[in-house]
């Protein structure tokens, strides 16, 4: 998977968690919609 850069969002499963450096704060979360 590509590392996220810029605005990021987490999957609906962990919507409350924010993405940081291509990884969500919760390991179960995955980043998407990365630009």
From Swiss-Prot:
Stored InterPro entries: Scorpion_toxin-like_sf, Scorpion_toxinS_K_inh
Annotated keywords: Amidation, Disulfide bond, Ion channel impairing toxin, Neurotoxin, Potassium channel impairing toxin, Pyrrolidone carboxylic acid, Secreted, Toxin, Voltage-gated potassium channel impairing toxin
Protein's cellular compartments: Secreted
Positions bearing the site annotation: Aromatic residue of the functional dyad: 32
Modified residues (Lysine amide): 35
Primary role: High affinity blocker of Kv1.3/KCNA3 channels of human T cells. Blocks Kv1.2/KCNA2 with an order of magnitude smaller than for Kv1.3/KCNA3.
Protein name: Potassium channel toxin alpha-KTx 6.12
Organism encoding this protein: Anuroctonus phaiodactylus (Mafia scorpion)
The organism's taxonomic lineage, starting at the top: Eukaryota, Metazoa, Ecdysozoa, Arthropoda, Chelicerata
């Amino acid at each position: 998977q590509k590392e996220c850069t810029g605005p990021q969002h987490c999957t609906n499963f962990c919507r409350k968690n924010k993405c940081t450096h291509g990884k969500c704060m919760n390991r179960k979360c995955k980043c998407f919609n990365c630009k």
